[in-house]
A protein has these predicted regions:
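Residues forming the flavin
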Residues: 1-222
Length: 222
């Protein structure tokens, strides 16, 4: 979505090919996973408009030092319905209830500016000429040509197999494994505010994080 908006700024009319469904219809498929244990291989937590983070709690925070123009990203979210508070908060947070609407509004901007969005359309073949990707062929048999941005997320294994089979150089990336740790909010407030009574009536819940190096690897909370 952000790549498409950037292309629009540069005068292009981007075409988004999305193998999953739109952000609203995805909710029905996610409900089936929880209630009926039925998984749609093309519409689930990984595939669909907004990607794997569409139904997260919308935290907008990074420890990376290669952040780029983070302020511009936050402004785009605000322009499409996120609270302006994310521009000032140390740990900006859109919220699970608001994020799908923000994603829909971003799609509307793309369409209003002449872009296209095709749902239920999977890339099956990269069209390569003289070692340059010039387009894609989809599962519907339709071909799209022009500049291609391949944003596969982390679970499109069929894409990686295709790339490997056709000699495209790929390499593995570091994997972070998360576990959930819970601490009583009163305990954290007492520690962070240095007050045995916690935060009192007026202060917000205290923020905290843990960072440690174990055998040369970083362990951190997020």
């Amino acid at each position: 979505l952000f790549a498409a908006l950037r292309l629009i700024e540069a005068g292009y009319r981007p075409v988004i090919v999305e193998r999953g469904k739109n952000v609203r219809d995805r909710k029905l498929d996610l409900a089936k996973i929880s209630r009926e244990h039925k998984v749609d291989s093309e519409s689930n937590y990984s595939f669909g408009e907004g990607g794997a983070g569409a139904y997260s709690d919308g935290k907008l925070y990074t420890r990376s030092k290669k952040r780029g123009n983070a302020e511009k990203i936050l402004n785009v979210f605000c322009q499409h319905g996120a609270s302006v508070s994310i521009l000032q908060d140390a740990h900006p947070h859109i919220g699970t209830d608001k994020l799908p609407r923000v994603i829909e509004n971003m799609r509307k901007t793309i369409l209003d500016c002449g872009g296209e969005v095709h749902f239920g359309t999977r890339m099956d073949v990269l069209l390569i000429e003289k070692d340059t990707v010039v387009g894609i062929e989809t599962n519907t048999g339709k071909t799209f040509r022009g500049p291609v941005i391949l944003a596969t997320g982390h679970s499109a294994r069929d894409v990686y197999r295709w790339l490997h089979t056709h000699g495209v150089e790929i390499e593995s990336k570091g994997l972070a494994v998360g576990v959930r740790l819970e601490h009583p909010s009163l305990l954290i407030d007492q520690i962070q505010y240095h007050n045995r009574n916690g935060r009192g009536k007026y202060l917000p819940a205290a923020e905290y994080s843990f960072v440690q190096q174990v055998e040369g690897r970083g362990v951190y909370s997020f």
